[in-house]
């Protein structure tokens, strides 16, 4: 990988298969990654490995039906999560690596952060330290469809809307992807999509790659002038190609990586007519519960999450027509907003109060409760450098209340042999609180229902039976 004595930049394409959809409360099953050079030529060996589930967790049946990976298979082929985390960490922290996948910003990266959090690695540094970065090809595909669709076949789903599912895109473009939802197959498919866009739409590809960087994005955002931009985001919905013209009203009052945008294609009357309390309530009301009320056409754009933003004229008139975006309506709304600067204060007030949030007392769900201090981070590094068998004798104090609980869970899940009698009892009590009679009854009912639903599908029934056996074995 050396090149003129300097480390070359590489892409690390990766994908997780997990035992459920919740990045903090569910667990990883399999990880796959391939490193490529800047032209997407494979460097080194493909990496695939499994994670052994700990004994305080049962997989979501629906996830196992999708991936086909049973907890028994993960246990037989896998290593404990501490070792699993260490391998991923060493891949992700090679300098000048751009870590990417398909829908990773919203899913896989959250899985990574939570794995690192549970296993005493910095949850964030991998994506920025040592010239590293992250990127996500899902929004690249969405942007390509909306802004420069030529040269690529765009499949539709059953509703006649564009589909950005990896297996649909690969099929429509004649790319081999026989084993969807196998992590390695998905990684190869993602590399193939990257090559396709780079070949067919090189200027768009290079623009989006450069603008994965938050400092580059910041340069596009002009709040005082409310300068309009084109924004591509899954939040807008496939019915309009996930695209709209937006205008920046203000920076978020607390999160310096978030800018408050108005969707210019929306109905802006609520912003003019309602006060900030009413707007906040409506913003956090599900669309289905709004009734006749107009939605609040405001969204946060997080510049550290690789959002797609570009100059307004990047969306050509013919593409706006194809996507059903009314340019004149957007221009009219922009004019009204510029004439009503008081709207800025209202939207800042909406976000000045935190989003309704129920704190969890489960330490696994507390990644976002705050950053760790330097002293605690140094102490966590010592935990990693200590032989597991010496962890019980480790005499360090932590300031953050989470760390003692994390350390206990880390030992109990990965190195149960290091627990003394009192600690074994504490872990047993923890497992009793997880596997309550109500939880187990609900789990059994779900398996039963799925067995009936898939009675004719031998493979699925076998997976469900394996889950039943696994539950009986560990509970």
From Swiss-Prot:
One of its GO terms (molecular function) is single-stranded DNA binding. The record marks 148, 207, 311, 338 as: Important for interaction with ssb. Coiled coil: none annotated. Residues 13-192 form the Exonuclease domain. InterPro entries: Exodeoxyribonuclease_I, EXOI_C, EXOI_SH3, EXOI_SH3_sf, Exonuc_1_C, Exonuclease_RNaseT/DNA_pol3, Oligoribonuclease, RNaseH-like_sf. Its EC number is 3.1.11.1. It catalyses: Exonucleolytic cleavage in the 3'- to 5'-direction to yield nucleoside 5'-phosphates. Keywords: DNA damage, DNA repair, DNA-binding, Exonuclease, Hydrolase, Magnesium, Metal-binding, Nuclease, Zinc. Mg(2+) 1 binds at residue 15. Changing residue 319 to A: 2-fold reduced ssb-binding. No effect on ssb-dependent nuclease activity. GO terms for biological process: DNA catabolic process; DNA repair; DNA replication termination. Binds 2 Mg(2+) ions per monomer. NCBIfam families: PRK11779.1. Monomer. Interacts with ssb (via C-terminus); this interaction stimulates the exonuclease activity by recruiting the enzyme to its substrate. PANTHER family: EXODEOXYRIBONUCLEASE I, OLIGORIBONUCLEASE, MITOCHONDRIAL. This is Exodeoxyribonuclease I. It comes from Escherichia coli (strain K12). The lineage of its organism: Bacteria, Pseudomonadati, Pseudomonadota, Gammaproteobacteria, Enterobacterales.
């Amino acid at each position: 990988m050396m090149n003129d004595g300097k480390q070359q930049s590489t892409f690390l394409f990766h994908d997780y298969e997990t035992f459920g959809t919740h990045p903090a409360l569910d667990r990883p099953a399999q990880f796959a990654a391939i490193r490529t050079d800047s032209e997407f030529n494979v460097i080194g060996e493909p990496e695939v490995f499994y994670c052994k589930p700990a004994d305080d967790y049962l997989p979501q049946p629906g996830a196992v039906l999708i991936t086909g990976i049973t907890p028994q298979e993960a246990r037989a082929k896998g290593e404990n999560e501490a070792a699993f985390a260490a391998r991923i960490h060493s891949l992700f922290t090679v300098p000048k690596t751009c870590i990417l996948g398909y829908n990773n910003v919203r899913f896989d990266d959250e899985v990574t952060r939570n794995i690192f959090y549970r296993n005493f690695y910095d949850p964030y540094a991998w994506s920025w330290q040592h010239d590293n970065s992250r990127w996500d090809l899902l929004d690249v595909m969405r942007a390509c469809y909306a802004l420069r669709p030529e040269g690529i076949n765009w499949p539709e789903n059953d509703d006649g809307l564009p589909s950005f599912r990896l297996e649909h895109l690969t099929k429509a473009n004649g790319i081999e992807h026989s084993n969807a939802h196998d992590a390695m197959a998905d990684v190869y498919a993602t590399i193939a999509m990257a090559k396709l866009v780079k070949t067919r739409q090189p200027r768009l590809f290079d623009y989006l790659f450069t603008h994965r960087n938050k400092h580059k994005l910041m340069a596009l955002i002009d709040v005082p002038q409310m300068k309009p931009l084109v924004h591509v985001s899954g939040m807008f919905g496939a019915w309009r190609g996930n695209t709209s013209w937006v205008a920046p009203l203000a920076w978020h009052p607390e999160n310096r990586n978030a800018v408050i945008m108005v969707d210019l294609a929306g109905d802006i009357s609520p912003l003019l007519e309602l006060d900030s309390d009413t707007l906040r309530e409506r913003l956090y009301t599900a669309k289905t519960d709004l009734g006749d009320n107009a939605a609040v056409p405001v969204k946060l754009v997080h510049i550290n999450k690789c959002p797609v933003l570009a100059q307004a004229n990047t969306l050509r008139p013919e593409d706006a027509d194809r996507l059903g975006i009314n340019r004149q309506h957007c221009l009219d709304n922009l004019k009204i907003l510029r004439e009503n600067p008081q709207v800025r204060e209202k939207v800042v007030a909406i976000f000045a109060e935190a989003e309704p949030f129920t704190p969890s007392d489960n330490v696994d769900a507390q990644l976002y409760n705050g950053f760790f201090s330097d002293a605690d981070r140094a102490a966590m590094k010592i935990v990693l450098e200590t032989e597991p068998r010496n962890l019980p004798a480790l005499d360090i104090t932590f300031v953050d209340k989470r760390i003692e609980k994390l350390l206990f869970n880390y030992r109990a899940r990965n190195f149960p042999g290091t627990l003394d009698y009192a600690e074994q009892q504490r872990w047993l009590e923890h497992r009793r609180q997880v596997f309550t009679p109500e939880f187990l009854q609900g789990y059994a009912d779900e398996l039963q229902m799925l067995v009936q639903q898939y009675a004719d599908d031998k493979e699925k029934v076998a997976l469900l039976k394996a889950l039943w056996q696994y539950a009986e074995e560990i509970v």
